[in-house]
Amino acid sequence: MGLLERLRKEWFIAGIALVIAAARLEPAVGVKGGPLKPEITITYIAVSAIFFNSGLSLKTEELTSALMHVKLHLFVQIFTLVFFPTAIWLFLQLLSITPINEWLLKGLQTVGCMPPPVSSAVILTKAVGGNEAAAIFNSAFGSFLLGSSSSVPFTSIFSQLFMTVVVPLIIGQIVRRYIKDWLERRKPPFGTISSCVLLMIIYTTFCDTFANPNIDLDKFSLIIIVFIIFSVQMSFMFLTFLFSTRSNSGFTPADTVAIIFCSTHKSLTLGIPMLKIVFAGYEHLSLISVPLLIYHPAQILLGSLLVPTIKSWMVSRQKALKLTRQPKVPVKV
């Protein structure tokens, strides 16, 4: 396979490398308040575009079916809001005897308590071809559930989720009713559109990361915390994969994809305001914020890199299940 053909096939991975390099060279372009105004273009326009895109591409029956998939919702919410923070707390009891900065460890604990984001898990699920409708419900519900029970103003959370998730999704569904035949005939590249939006999110996320003011943190602690975060993400993704692919789990391969991403992703948009309120007045707030600031780009980067692998598994698994369900033709003697 030639280089150009390889790049065309793996354009998304190449795109990730390019946007990260661009963010490193000139982070001021994509930071909050910069020329791109990500606080508007990403928080509102890009997220709204994602869910309008989902409303256009998803059949109403798929959304209804996902809403009624109570077992999947319980799995994701219990893993995210109960298992995740509990497991992190137990892990930190071991790390507390190490020389790692105690405020970084407190930051890791807060990461475990954060709600899921409303965009990255949905885009990655769509990129793989998983149960996008279930990902939409769980991402929005998890953010609303934990966000509304925290110190962050309830009205602010509700209005933002309503305007950027619910309204675009409904509008997409309404538009779909009128252009349904055209959509089925032309088959627009919804997955590619969502992937391009994700590249925008990755770019602005890394702009914020690279432009972040210098924090009084030794390189050893920083390297260790990055290693721990990637290890935690990989371990939890593997755990959700194991739990959701058991023979008696009742989940399809597409469900598993949604579960993997929705159960392990954490929100920076809700997370930072929550930290600023809960730890207001703490001189070590910047250190407490470091794990979340690392976790957010790490989850997007890791998830994006794993898209081809997870997609390959899902397709092969779906084919295998289809073959096992086909009726056996009796052999004539």
UniProtKB/Swiss-Prot annotation:
Q: Which residues cross the membrane?
A: 11-31, 38-58, 72-92, 104-124, 127-147, 152-172, 190-210, 223-243, 259-279, 287-307
Kindly indicate whether the keyword Transmembrane belongs to this entry: yes
Superkingdom of the source?
Answer: Eukaryota
> How the protein sits in the membrane?
Multi-pass membrane protein
Supply one GO molecular-function term: symporter activity
Q: Which GO terms describe its cellular component?
A: endoplasmic reticulum membrane; Golgi membrane; plasma membrane
Purpose:
Involved in teeth and skeletal development. Has an essential role in the biosynthesis and trafficking of glycosaminoglycans and glycoproteins to produce a proper functioning extracellular matrix. Required for extracellular matrix mineralization. Also involved in the regulation of cellular calcium homeostasis. Does not show transport activity towards bile acids or steroid sulfates.
| Classification via InterPro entries | Na+/solute_symporter_sf, Put_Na-Bile_cotransptr
What is stated as this protein's family in its record?
Belongs to the bile acid:sodium symporter (BASS) (TC 2.A.28) family.
Q: Where in the cell is it found?
A: Cell membrane; Endoplasmic reticulum membrane; Golgi apparatus membrane
Q: What is this protein called?
A: Sodium/bile acid cotransporter 7
- Keyword Transmembrane helix (UniProt): yes
Q: Name one GO biological process term.
A: sodium ion transport
Q: Which organism is it from?
A: Gallus gallus (Chicken)
| Entry keyword set | Cell membrane, Endoplasmic reticulum, Golgi apparatus, Ion transport, Membrane, Sodium, Sodium transport, Symport, Transmembrane, Transmembrane helix, Transport
Extracellular topological segments = 32-37, 93-103, 148-151, 211-222, 280-286
Q: Which residues lie on this side of the membrane: Cytoplasmic?
A: 1-10, 59-71, 125-126, 173-189, 244-258, 308-333
